[in-house]
Amino acid sequence: MKHTKITIHTDGSCLNNPGRGGWAAAVRRYADDEEVKKALLSGHAPATTNNRMEMTAALRGLGKIKRNEQAQITVYSDSQLLIGGMTEWLPNWQRNAWRKSSGKPVENRDLWEALVAVCEGLDVKWTWVRGHNGDARNEEVDAIAFAAASKVA
C-alpha cells in the first residue's frame, strides 16, 4: 500500500493593507514521496487585509480536499497569525465566546469558523515557514498571490 500525503502551501498578499488583495494555494498529493497531482488555486478581493487573504488561501486549499480523505495533510504558511490561531489560540477563543485574552473580539471570526469546519474529520498539521527566505514552494505561492492582488481593478 502506498503512503499518501498532501501538502498545501499558502500565501496572501495585500497592497496598501488594507486594500486590494490576492491569495494563492498550491495543493500537492504525493504517493510514496512522488508528486502525483498538483493544483494551483488563486483569487483576489478589491478591499481586504493581508490576514484575510492568508486565511482565505488556507481555506480554499483545504476546500479542495475530499471530506473522507485519510492522508496526512500539512498546511504551510508564512503567516504567524494563521499558524498560531490554528495550533494554539482557537480553543481559548471558542471557550471565551470568540474574544481574545484582552477581551476584544477576535478579528475575522467568519474565516476562523470556516477553517474549523473545513478541517473537521481531516488530519491537518499546520506548519510555519519563514517568508521570503528561499523556500521555493512559499516563493511560488507568494508570487501568485501578489499577481492576483495586482490584477484587482
Per-range role (PLM):
Residues 1-52, 56, 60-67, 71, ...:
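RNase H-like nuclease fold core
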Residues 13-20, 59-140, 144, 149:
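RNase H catalytic domain
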